[in-house]
């Protein structure tokens, strides 16, 4: 054993700054320690020397120079490499953080600054009652995000005060928290699937939760639309390079908030990062559906995603409808008994969860192999050729499509047969001009083959489009989701069809609407207010009978049908190239896009990726595909780890299944996104 003299010679003084919540200023505490003292022993000495009776269980040591937490309390100071010159801070692991939600509402809640962001987001989503937290993450707003708003504030003499939803007593504050909001893994419905209000049987849960009735209303219902002036003051990306800037601030999911320089009471954006939405269910996901709707709405209004004027009016009509229903839903009494029988609701929920399909069609699905056969027009783009469609006889069976010169030759060899498994299916529709097209991008070794199909009418288009979409996922028309998919497509086409609208019930003059609030500023400038209101009201007749939650889901589906949906852009420089390009990352592919023209150059499917990693020395993302195809690029608009995490994150999400319930393999996520060989 060491004598006291030996200990003194082997020990040294360590200064620890204590971040005491009850005092305004931090205080330094000097301890005498040795290198073989474990971190837990240091914390014990600190608490004894501070001599204040309180719960210190949430406190931990933060090493300022190394920018890391000392969370392994059994490790010694020597093992961590802590010496006398180390600047340590004894501080709570949970701190207040301000989050701006997709609906632009600001919430303030207590979050772990020591847990990795993946875990912190999971806890945040439990507090806010958002399932499938793996689809979301935290984003630092880019410098241009508040640019226009600040410019306007300079001319405003009165300070702007914002109504912040304070959830300081949120369950993320401790591991042994009380009721986790309305978050539930049971099969008990917790929301009315029609209007999104909390089911009466769950209202008692609110007594222990920061999510009161009013707070739930703020999160689950759409907020009143912004004025056209406020909308015009928001940042709107004008190019792919501008859109790339918006995605530069995603936090590293494998590191903590503190490690990434986030300060207490700092401001971040909570957003859906991955455009792969799993198991959306109105009975559990009122908040999730609303926030997803809001993110889609702002993407349309701020032109973060392109759409036609016809589509913009459909989105405007749905927004107007949702806004009206939200105002009426918020005035309802949440505690009223549901008129829906519980058994009927459970069966209805099962039908929604199983994504359509009836039990009596099961035998038919097994024994029949459905087939589509009809005349369609085909066009294959080639350089220096005009876009000319030629008619062929097409046959669709299993996941393959074949075409013949005419119907009589169907029993012979086709001109070409293509397997659509893994292909990209893009709608190419203009209802007003009666054009119903399908764009197919079929994967080949060095990219994609492009072809266009043209249908004659809505029903034909819906059947073939649904078949192509299922085939791209490896499913056939025998799948129970085929029929619902056809109906969804037809429903969306009817929303676009102005001729199907009934006679307008009220004139624009009598409408309680500011039409400029529901379209992008650029679209608003093209039309007079009365003209715009009349067109929105005309489109509204096609959706006027929709319940609130269904209208939001229709909006999300329409958003998903846009050609650019799900693409996240980054400015990159490919290895061997002398110019910058745009890299588009989607749920199933990478796209190299010409930064000047916006034209796709090459597409790589995730299914063809063999491995990918980050070369930290050169800061390059290196990807190996099948058939010995390699590509490497340096990220110019963001850290290379962000793009690497996107690729691994989407591959991780593709492993989810309903058999897993809501348990996630967090280790697999970090293995796929960590950026190591």
UniProtKB/Swiss-Prot annotation:
SMART domains: B41, PH. Coiled coil: none annotated. Residues 337-433 form the PH domain. One of its GO terms (cellular component) is cytoskeleton. It is a peripheral membrane protein. GO terms for molecular function: integrin binding. It is found in: Cytoplasm, Cytoskeleton; Cell junction, Focal adhesion; Cell projection, Ruffle membrane. The keyword Cytoplasm applies. The modification Phosphoserine is found at residues 170, 179, 361. One of its GO terms (biological process) is keratinocyte proliferation. The keyword Cytoplasm applies. InterPro entries: Band_41_domain, FERM_2, FERM_central, Kindlin/fermitin, Kindlin_2_N, PH-like_dom_sf, PH_domain, PH_Kindlin/fermitin. Pfam families: FERM_M (PF00373), Kindlin_2_N (PF18124), PH (PF00169). Residues 96-653 form the FERM domain. Its main location: cytoplasm. Keywords: Cell adhesion, Cell junction, Cell membrane, Cell projection, Cytoplasm, Cytoskeleton, Membrane, Phosphoprotein. Involved in cell adhesion. Contributes to integrin activation. When coexpressed with talin, potentiates activation of ITGA2B. Required for normal keratinocyte proliferation. Required for normal polarization of basal keratinocytes in skin, and for normal cell shape. Required for normal adhesion of keratinocytes to fibronectin and laminin, and for normal keratinocyte migration to wound sites. The FERM domain is not correctly detected by PROSITE or Pfam techniques because it contains the insertion of a PH domain. The FERM domain contains the subdomains F1, F2 and F3. It is preceded by a F0 domain with a ubiquitin-like fold. The F0 domain is required for integrin activation and for localization at focal adhesions. Interacts with the cytoplasmic domain of integrins ITGB1 and ITGB3. Belongs to the kindlin family. This is Fermitin family homolog 1. It comes from Pongo abelii. The gene is FERMT1.
């Amino acid at each position: 054993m060491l004598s006291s003299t030996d200990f003194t010679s082997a020990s040294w003084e360590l200064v620890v700054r204590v971040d005491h919540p009850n005092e305004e200023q931090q205080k330094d505490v000097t301890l005498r320690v040795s290198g073989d003292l474990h971190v837990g022993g240091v914390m014990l000495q600190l608490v004894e020397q501070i001599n204040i009776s309180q719960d210190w269980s949430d406190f931990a040591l933060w090493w300022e120079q190394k920018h890391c937490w000392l969370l392994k309390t059994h490790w010694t100071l020597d093992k961590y490499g802590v010496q006398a010159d180390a600047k340590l801070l004894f501080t709570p692991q949970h701190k207040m953080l301000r989050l701006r939600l997709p609906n632009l509402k600001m919430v303030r809640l207590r979050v772990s600054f020591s847990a990795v962001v993946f875990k912190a987001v999971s806890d945040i989503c439990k507090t806010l009652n958002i399932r499938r937290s793996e689809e979301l993450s935290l984003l630092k707003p880019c410098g241009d995000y508040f640019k226009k708003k600040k410019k306007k504030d300079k001319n405003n003499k009165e300070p702007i005060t914002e109504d912040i939803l304070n959830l300081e007593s949120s369950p993320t504050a401790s591991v042994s928290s009380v009721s986790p909001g309305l978050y539930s893994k049971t099969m008990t419905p917790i929301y009315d699937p029609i209007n999104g209000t909390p089911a009466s049987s769950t209202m008692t849960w609110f007594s222990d939760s920061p999510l009161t009735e009013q707070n739930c209303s703020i999160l689950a219902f759409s907020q009143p639309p912004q004025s056209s002036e406020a909308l015009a003051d928001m940042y709107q990306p004008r190019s792919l390079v501008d859109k790339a800037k918006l995605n530069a601030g995603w936090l590293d999911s494998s590191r903590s908030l503190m490690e990434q320089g986030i300060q207490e009471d700092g401001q971040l954006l909570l957003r859906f990062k991955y455009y792969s939405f799993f198991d959306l269910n109105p009975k559990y996901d009122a908040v999730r559906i609303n926030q997803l709707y809001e993110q889609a709405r702002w993407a349309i209004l701020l032109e973060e995603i392109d759409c036609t004027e016809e589509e913009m009016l459909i989105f405007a009509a749905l927004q107007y409808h949702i806004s009206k229903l939200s105002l009426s839903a918020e005035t309802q009494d949440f505690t009223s008994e549901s008129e829906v029988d519980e058994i009927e609701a459970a069966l209805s929920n099962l039908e929604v969860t199983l994504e359509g399909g009836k039990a009596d069609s099961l035998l038919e699905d097994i024994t029949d192999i459905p087939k589509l056969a009809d005349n369609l027009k085909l066009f294959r783009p080639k350089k220096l050729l005009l876009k000319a469609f030629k008619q062929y006889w097409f046959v669709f069976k299993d996941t393959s499509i074949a075409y013949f010169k005419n119907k009589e030759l169907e029993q012979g060899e086709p001109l070409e047969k293509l397997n659509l498994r893994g292909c990209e299916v893009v709608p190419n529709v203009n209802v007003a001009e009666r054009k119903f097209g399908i764009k197919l991008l079929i994967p080949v070794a060095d990219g994609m083959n492009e072809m266009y199909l043209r249908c004659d009418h809505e029903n034909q288009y819906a059947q073939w489009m649904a078949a192509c979409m299922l085939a791209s996922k490896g499913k056939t028309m025998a799948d129970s989701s085929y029929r619902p998919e056809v109906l969804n497509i037809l429903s969306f086409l009817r929303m676009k069809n102005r001729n199907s609208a009934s006679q307008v019930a009220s004139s624009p003059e009598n409408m309680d609407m500011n039409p400029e609030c529901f379209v992008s500023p650029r679209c608003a400038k093209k039309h007079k207010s009365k003209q715009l209101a009349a067109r929105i009201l005309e489109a509204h007749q096609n959706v006027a009978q929709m319940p609130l939650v269904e209208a939001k889901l229709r909006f999300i589906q329409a958003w998903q049908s846009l050609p650019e949906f799900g693409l996240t852009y980054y400015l990159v420089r490919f290895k061997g190239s002398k110019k910058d390009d745009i890299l588009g990352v989607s749920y199933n592919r990478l796209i190299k896009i010409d930064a000047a023209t916006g034209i796709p150059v090459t597409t790589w499917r995730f299914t063809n990726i063999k491995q990918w990693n980050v070369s930290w020395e050169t800061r390059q993302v290196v990807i190996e595909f099948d058939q010995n195809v390699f590509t490497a690029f340096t990220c110019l608009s963001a850290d290379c780890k962000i793009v690497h995490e996107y690729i691994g994150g989407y591959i991780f999400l593709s492993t989810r299944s309903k058999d897993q319930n809501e348990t996630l393999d967090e280790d697999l996520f970090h293995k796929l996104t960590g950026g190591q060989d």
